[in-house]
Amino acid sequence: MAVYTDISEEELTAFLRHYPVGKLLSYKGIAEGTENSNYLLHTTAGAYILTLYERRVDRSDLPFFLGLMEHLARKGVSCPLPVKRLDDGLIGELAGRPAALITFLEGMWMRRPTALHCGQVGKALADLHQAAEDFPLKRPNALGPEGWRRLWEGAKARADEVEPGLAREVDAEFALLERDWPKDLPSGVIHADLFPDNVFFLGGELSGLIDFYFACNDLLAYDLATCLNAWCFEKDISYNLTKGAALLAGYQAVRPLTREEIEMLPLLARGSALRFMLTRLYDWLTIPDGALVKKRDPLEYLRRLRFHRQVRTASEYGIELA
């Protein structure tokens, strides 16, 4: 979450007249994240998250994102729900941008997740994959391999400013991933961004998943590989085998991986690391000065990518092989 667009109290009050949420009491911007402008609202009816969609979010994708939240909630997945307007729509407009009001989910994200947290995340991800199996809408992954290439074309010219030799290294990585990327593994709806700040806990128990604005249809094991990258590396970018084993075991307790998925896990983890390195690099070079947003270091994911290059089998991630 982040803030790119400032809004006035008058604008917000007028916007809220179209929702059954009472009167505005207070609001404040949320700085974490990189994609949309987000505000925490308190009204006489409760707490809500207001999201203004910008940057990489296409308005035509909003029915997928918001509909997915409704679908998952009906299937028992704990996640926020979009608030219906008085005209029964889900999408309004504020400050010239599409906007939606979302229910507030109780909990806190874990700054220092343990293996116990990772096990719960693995299970929750598998639950999400199964719950979304009959979701009728489709959305291709705009940040799959073709999307990585477009990002790279926008950042390559200045890449060596961030890390000497980065352009050559990433070009070599593209050559391998574009040649070997799997296309026939089990696929379905994936979250695609299940980082620690998108998972809430209460009293040590997972209380819900948030931020579905990268959700799409893609390889299920790629979603799991993204979680390995997001949850199982320490601050010094060393891989925590105990966390990895817990995350993978939690996932497989609900949805066992196929032999082919297990074999491809190192390559999928490389692709995931490249994807997040590229979006961080692009944002590092292009986010406007003065935006209330935290830039994230692309080199953290370059170091993950280098780790995955050395992995020969998925057993090195902590998965139990039959």
From Swiss-Prot:
The lineage of its organism: Bacteria, Pseudomonadati, Pseudomonadota, Alphaproteobacteria, Hyphomicrobiales. This is Homoserine kinase. It catalyses: L-homoserine + ATP = O-phospho-L-homoserine + ADP + H(+). GO terms for molecular function: ATP binding; homoserine kinase activity. It comes from Chelativorans sp. (strain BNC1). InterPro entries: Aminoglycoside_PTrfase (IPR002575), Homoserine_kinase_II (IPR005280), Kinase-like_dom_sf (IPR011009), Pseudomonas-type_ThrB (IPR050249). Belongs to the pseudomonas-type ThrB family. Keywords: Amino-acid biosynthesis, ATP-binding, Kinase, Nucleotide-binding, Threonine biosynthesis, Transferase. The keyword Nucleotide-binding applies. Its EC number is 2.7.1.39. The gene is thrB. One of its GO terms (biological process) is threonine biosynthetic process. It is an enzyme of class 2 (transferase). HAMAP family: Homoser_kinase_2 (MF_00301). Pathway: Amino-acid biosynthesis; L-threonine biosynthesis; L-threonine from L-aspartate: step 4/5. It holds the Pfam family APH. The keyword Ribosomal protein does not apply.
